[in-house]
Amino acid sequence: MILRFALAATLAAASTALARPPSTAADVAAAERRFAAMAQAEGLGPAFAAWSAEDAVIFTPRPASAKAAYADPNNRPAGRLLWWPVYAGIARSGELGFSTGPFEVEGGRAHGWYFTIWRRESDGRWRWVLDHGTPTREAAPYRPDAALTAAPAGRPARRAAGSWDEVRSAEARLAAALAADARSALPAALWDDGRIMRPGPQPAVGRAAFAAAAAAGPERIEESRIGGGVSKAGDLAWTYGEAAWDEGGARLEGHYVRVWQRRSGGWKLLVDEMTPLPRRRAPAAGG
């Protein structure tokens, strides 16, 4: 009897999985839009808490557990924030994806581009595992119905079990190259349709824009990876870590977030984001 029920449950689970249509980049974008809609309807705090995975990472400004941070009422985001996806991608295995697009704080007090890593959980729901963003000098026009650009599909690994080691090796090689000559190394590490996200300008897209963005950046970047993950298909991965560089005569520290994709040429970047930590304010005179 027990065996019969166990077999029936297994078959039911299998049929449910088979009945579920394959996920696409549009599904990742749809999850992002539902997340944004809940933030408008119920507030940022409830939305960020409801849509975050148990192991989700936020930056406060250093990497921290989202669940632990939101447990403190003082850390819950407040105010009104608008954002919408314009670029997204997904693994062939359908459980790991990302999206990015413009954001704007109510009243135009701040604006930039968000960057979210998404994972489809065992219950079929999408939840974000990392949320970050880059401020820009100018706001993008508010277009929540903007057309979505989907990243092309990656190439699945023959042995998915070794994919994370490959990503770590690729990132270690990139870190060494960035420490020697970041302006040459960064463009070479990107797929042609990738993105560079830095504070100030809009995201750089295309080879000419990559070269310009890298030329405007630091000569050398020192990095240390903190974490990340890879898809079951071994074709998409995300990483984040610490970064340090010299700029304008000052030593800056910050963080990077990346999405890597495997294609026929190996592993390269779809998105490379790097932002400095907020600068400390000088103490008031006499304080």
Please describe what each predicted stretch is.
Residues 1-8:
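Sec-dependent signal peptide recognition
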Residues 8-19:
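Hydrophobic h-region of N-terminal signal peptides that target proteins for export
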Residues 18-46, 50, 135-184, 188, ...:
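Short, low-complexity N-terminal intrinsically disordered segments enriched in polar/charged residues
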Residues 23, 200-207, 214-287:
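C-terminal functional regions that serve as terminal interaction/effector modules
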Residues 35, 83-84, 96-100, 113-118, ...:
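Short, structured motif recognition centered on aromatic/hydrophobic residues
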Residues 41-62, 67-68, 180-199, 204-208:
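Short, well-ordered alpha-helical segments enriched in acidic and aromatic residues
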Residues 62, 71-111, 211-253:
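Surface-exposed, charged secondary-structure patches
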Residues 111-147, 255-280:
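Short beta-strand edge/turn micro-motifs at domain boundaries
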